């Protein structure tokens, strides 16, 4: 079982609270707490996060920074598709992707998405009453979509599902997002994701994506041996829009 060893919050350079090594202090003007309770929070035997305690114990204005923090955290999402689908955040339970597409009358939109991003054309059958699985028409046969898709198309279905949810997201991290994509498809997916109205992080081994056509160098990060640094902090060279960032990377111009 995990335990919080230390917590601290600083807002605009002002310390709100700090709890560490059995000690606790808080901005008493913003959050007046009696001494006995402060001692209990210092010990915190039941492992209650201080932020959660403040959110549930004090009436706060709608624009209070703790409310904004809570809204941001509640809008965070992590997902990936590496053989099977996984996610954390934004939703409380699993959803059958194809049932969702059918129920929300998104079949034609999903078909257009697949064509626009990957060039693939599918003819989906009109679902019958109670059908929860997408069926493709091949010749005169109705074939389950999942029976003919590639791993990349399967990953695109998951991406499409979460894109319908990203209007409520604040921060999205897609782990190994292009594990089953070819280079051009990964590039097209990035163009869509990076135009969303939320913060999006993707992880990849594809250096083809290290280009100013997608992101500025300060928005590209290198992860190596538990360290993460933006490209601009990995070199003394001046980085300009016309530079071939991938070529520089392959030439060992960046050091973490």
Model regions: which residues?
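Secondary-structure transition/turn motif
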Residues: 8-13, 29-30, 136-141, 231-235
């Amino acid at each position: 079982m995990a335990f919080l060893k230390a917590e601290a919050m600083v807002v605009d350079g002002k310390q709100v609270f700090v709890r560490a090594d059995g000690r606790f202090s808080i901005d008493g003007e913003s959050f007046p707490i009696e001494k006995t309770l402060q001692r209990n929070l210092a010990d915190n035997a039941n492992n209650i996060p201080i932020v959660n305690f403040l959110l549930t114990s004090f009436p706060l204005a709608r624009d209070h920074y703790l409310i904004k923090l809570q809204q941001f955290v509640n809008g965070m999402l992590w997902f990936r598709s590496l053989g099977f689908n996984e996610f954390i955040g934004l939703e409380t339970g699993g959803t059958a992707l194809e049932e969702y597409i059918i129920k929300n009358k998104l079949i034609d939109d999903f078909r257009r998405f697949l064509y626009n991003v990957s060039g693939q054309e599918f003819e989906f059958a009109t679902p019958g009453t109670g059908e929860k699985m997408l069926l493709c028409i091949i010749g005169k046969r109705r074939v389950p979509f999942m029976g003919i898709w590639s791993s990349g198309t399967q990953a695109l279905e998951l991406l499409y599902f979460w894109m319908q949810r990203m209007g409520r997201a604040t921060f999205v991290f897609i782990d190994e997002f292009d594990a089953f994509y070819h280079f051009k498809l990964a590039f097209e997916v990035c163009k869509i994701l990076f135009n969303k109205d939320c913060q999006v992080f993707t992880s990849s081994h594809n250096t083809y994506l290290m280009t100013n056509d997608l992101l500025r160098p300060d928005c590209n990060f290198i992860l190596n041996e538990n360290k993460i640094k933006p490209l601009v902090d990995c070199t003394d060279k001046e980085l300009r829009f016309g530079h071939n960032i991938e070529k520089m990377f392959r030439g060992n111009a960046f050091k973490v």
